[in-house]
Amino acid sequence: MKIVFALGGSVLMPKEGASVDKIKEYADVFKKMKDENNEICIVVGGGNTARTYISVAREFANESFCDEIGILATRMNSMLLISALDNYAVKKVPENFKDAEIILNLNKIVVMGGTHPAHTTDAVAASLAEYIDADMLVVATNVDGVYDKDPRKHADAKKIKQLTTKELLNITGSASIEAGSSTIIDPLASKIIDRAKLKTIVIEGAPEEILKILNNTHSGTIINP
């Protein structure tokens, strides 16, 4: 199976900072998936690293410049994961889909970050999944699925177990796309998912939950074309 992951930066790099054990856990999960004959691409978000830098830069620079800072943060996080993947990955972060596909064709795990200003890593992951004709897009984030409203702000938020790509568009249509924003799936990514008819799973990004997608025992939300 060919799978593209959008791995939230705040999942890989929480507020307390990088953890050797945590990075190793993620690397081991992706190695195991690769060993089971899956083709794996991972697009890593900027998370707290990006947001910290962007919050300062925004006092001096426009959103496009802040986007560039965010992209660099995603590539730093990508390099950290690459370092833990040993010879399962190429020691380089591809900056475009053509280079990502070359690495995938070398039978390696692809790890990359952002590519263009105003494109979140969710949008990059969705575009990459479309480009390589992936079987599945997995959005691994700090919320365990898609809700009718933000569960971090609303105690009465209800989790949606399954929905269509059209329904996803309705839910995400008004989300923010400022540099460093952290919505579950942003509007551009939702449009690409719908256009490409991508099967998408949104899960809480713990390593053990990521592994469960292979046997469909995860507790996330399934988005069908």
Swiss-Prot record:
InterPro entries membership: AceGlu_kinase-like_sf, Asp/Glu/Uridylate_kinase, Uridylate_kinase, Uridylate_kinase_arch/spir
EC number: 2.7.4.22
Activity control note: Inhibited by UTP.
Biochemical pathway: Pyrimidine metabolism; CTP biosynthesis via de novo pathway; UDP from UMP (UMPK route): step 1/1
Disulfide topology: none
Binding-site residues, UMP: G46, D67, T115, H116, P117, A118, H119, T120, T121
Keyword Nucleus carried by entry: no
Signal peptide positions (record): none
SUPFAM superfamilies: Carbamate kinase-like
Residues binding ATP, per UniProt: G9, S10, G47, R51, T141, N142, Y147, D150
Major enzyme class: transferase
Reactions this protein catalyses: UMP + ATP = UDP + ADP
Subcellular location, principal: cytoplasm
Family the UniProt entry places it in: Belongs to the UMP kinase family.
Protein name according to UniProt: Uridylate kinase
